Amino acid sequence: MSEQIKTNGVTLILKKASVKNTIAMPDFIFDHKMYYNPAEFAWKYIGGTWKMPILWRLNKATLRYSELKKTLPHIKHKVLSSQLKELEESGLISKKIYAEVPPKTEYAITEKGKETIPVIEIIRNYGLKLMEEKGINVNLKK
């Protein structure tokens, strides 16, 4: 048995839990896509190979494109540009273009973006734990 609630363009499909005291993980539709839980929806914004490393670095400092690229040597320019654009569109980072020659562009984390840092840290620590369990040794840079 389920109940549908429409709010702000999002259709939530609430299913009655069969186990008492469970935390709701509702199905919902947003922007014509079905999501099966809120974690999947959050992953849309911070998931993938590069979004979390970009947010992590911008949390430490405001960086120009070239500075950010140097800290992520394996990312392709096209991918970095698209990831920055997606993060900016979702309000997690801001882009400031200075009217000078040569042109200067800086990227900074927003307050909304700073909300992701504790989540990223938990995921990072869990990943490190899994790596340790699998015998993967990594030289961590602070």
Regions found by a protein language model. Name each.
Residues 3-26, 34, 56, 114-142:
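Amphipathic alpha-helical dimerization/coiled-coil segments
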Residues 75-78, 88-90, 104, 118-119, ...:
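Short, intrinsically disordered/low-complexity patches at protein termini
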Residues 51, 63, 92, 125-128:
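Generic structural signal for secondary-structure transition and capping sites
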Residues 23-27, 36-40, 55-56, 91-95, ...:
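Short hydrophobic/aromatic-rich motifs at helix boundaries and adjacent loops
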Residues 41, 70, 82, 118-121, ...:
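Generic recognition of well-ordered alpha-helical segments
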Residues 66-98, 102:
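Canonical helix-turn-helix DNA-binding module
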Residues 99-123:
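Basic, amphipathic "hinge/linker" alpha-helix immediately C-terminal to the N-terminal HTH DNA-binding motif
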Residues 30-79, 106:
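N-terminal helix-turn-helix DNA-binding core of bacterial DNA-binding proteins
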